[in-house]
Amino acid sequence: MAALRRMLHLPSLMMGTCRPFAGSLADSCLADRCLWDRLHAQPRLGTVPTFDWFFGYDEVQGLLLPLLQEAQAASPLRVLDVGCGTSSLCTGLYTKSPHPVDVLGVDFSPVAVAHMNSLLEGGPGQTPLCPGHPASSLHFMHADAQNLGAVASSGSFQLLLDKGTWDAVARGGLPRAYQLLSECLRVLNPQGTLIQFSDEDPDVRLPCLEQGSYGWTVTVQELGPFRGITYFAYLIQGSH
């Protein structure tokens, strides 16, 4: 039922992109790199420079900022967004966080990475993004979230964000989703937090996360509803 619900809601979840193309995603394999290259190459609606799956940064800053404040032992705090696409999560943290953050967004779509680097640096007719804290930084890298060896060493990030990436990867089979989770936990600091944002029901997602996150604490928080849809933040945390 949760999978069916995701497909039915898919067109309404695509913010800042071409809706006819977004609607066709319900019939596609969301683990297909070429699909996302085509999606990220679509013209944006109006002046919106980003494309958000589910929701944007503003809807979850109330959850993220307290976590950043609690984890100020590392300054700036290292944040990794896996499967960042052209979402506003990375740019929102960079431009709006009052706490110093070192944000890295990775995606397997070179089209998405090129778009976000252009947005960061200020492409034609655009102003470069300015940090919310003078010590903050933002970078984007072309990389597969299921193999982060070229991105980071073990335990190097204090906060990991996954907004819809598990959902997309799992469409290619649960073993791939578990590989994604394993890589995220490998590069996560033992005292850090991984957050998966999804509309998948807890009775479906929690058993998977508990199985794949042995030794970590798994909890869930309800988010929204946003535009009539309830979402969930699945938090996987080490010892604090």
Curated annotation (Swiss-Prot):
**Keyword annotations from UniProtKB, A to Z:** Methyltransferase, Mitochondrion, S-adenosyl-L-methionine, Transferase, Transit peptide
* Any one biological process term the GO annotation gives: peptidyl-lysine trimethylation
Regulation of activity: Citrate synthase-lysine methyltransferase activity is inhibited by S-adenosylhomocysteine (AdoHcy) and oxaloacetate (OAA).
Its Enzyme Commission number(s) read 2.1.1.-
* Claim: Lipid biosynthesis is one of the keywords in the record: no
GO annotation, cellular component aspect: mitochondrial matrix; mitochondrion
Gene3D superfamilies named in the record: Vaccinia Virus protein VP39 (3.40.50.150)
Q: Does the keyword Nucleotidyltransferase apply?
A: no
Q: Which reaction does it catalyse?
A: L-lysyl-[citrate synthase] + S-adenosyl-L-methionine = N(6)-methyl-L-lysyl-[citrate synthase] + S-adenosyl-L-homocysteine + H(+); N(6)-methyl-L-lysyl-[citrate synthase] + S-adenosyl-L-methionine = N(6),N(6)-dimethyl-L-lysyl-[citrate synthase] + S-adenosyl-L-homocysteine + H(+); N(6),N(6)-dimethyl-L-lysyl-[citrate synthase] + S-adenosyl-L-methionine = N(6),N(6),N(6)-trimethyl-L-lysyl-[citrate synthase] + S-adenosyl-L-homocysteine + H(+)
What InterPro entries is this protein classified in?
Answer: Lys/N-term_MeTrsfase_sf, Methyltranfer_dom, SAM-dependent_MTases_sf
Q: What class of enzyme is it?
A: transferase
Any idea where this protein resides?
Mitochondrion
Member of which family?
Belongs to the methyltransferase superfamily.
PANTHER family with a match to the protein in the record: CITRATE SYNTHASE-LYSINE N-METHYLTRANSFERASE CSKMT, MITOCHONDRIAL, SAM-DEPENDENT METHYLTRANSFERASE SUPERFAMILY PROTEIN
User: What is the protein's name according to its record?
Assistant: Citrate synthase-lysine N-methyltransferase CSKMT, mitochondrial
In which organism is this protein found?
Answer: Homo sapiens
